[in-house]
């Protein structure tokens, strides 16, 4: 039989990283918020939060830290 009783709450940490490389002109538009598809960085932030918290699970989004770094010399975010 499987024990399904309450368990002690634990703190867990996960780290994920990704990089999107693009032409310098495209990167400039994305950073300036003038890309033809709208607010690319805003959508990326929301997508990251949704993936991290698995939207069906009740979790407070304040428990997540997210950072988007602009790297113009590498033509990436």
Curated annotation (Swiss-Prot):
Which Enzyme Commission numbers does its entry carry?
4.6.1.17
InterPro entries this protein is in? MoaC_sf, Mopterin_CF_biosynth-C_dom
Pfam family, any one: MoaC
Q: Which domain of life is it from?
A: Bacteria
Gene Ontology biological process terms, A to Z? Mo-molybdopterin cofactor biosynthetic process
Catalytic reaction(s) noted: (8S)-3',8-cyclo-7,8-dihydroguanosine 5'-triphosphate = cyclic pyranopterin phosphate + diphosphate
The misc remark on file is: Seems to be specific for the biogenesis of DMSO reductase.
- Record's subunit section: Homohexamer; trimer of dimers.
Functional description taken from the UniProt entry: Catalyzes the conversion of (8S)-3',8-cyclo-7,8-dihydroguanosine 5'-triphosphate to cyclic pyranopterin monophosphate (cPMP).
**Family that this chain belongs to:** Belongs to the MoaC family.
* Protein name from the UniProt record: Cyclic pyranopterin monophosphate synthase
Recorded name of the encoding gene: moaC
């Amino acid at each position: 039989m499987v024990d399904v009783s309450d368990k002690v709450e634990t703190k867990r940490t996960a780290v994920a990283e990704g990089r999107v490389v693009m032409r310098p002109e495209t990167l400039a538009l994305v950073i300036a918020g003038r890309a033809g598809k709208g607010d690319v960085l805003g959508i990326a932030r929301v997508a990251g939060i949704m993936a991290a918290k698995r939207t069906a699970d009740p979790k407070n989004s304040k428990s997540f830290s997210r950072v988007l770094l602009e790297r113009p010399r590498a033509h990436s975010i």
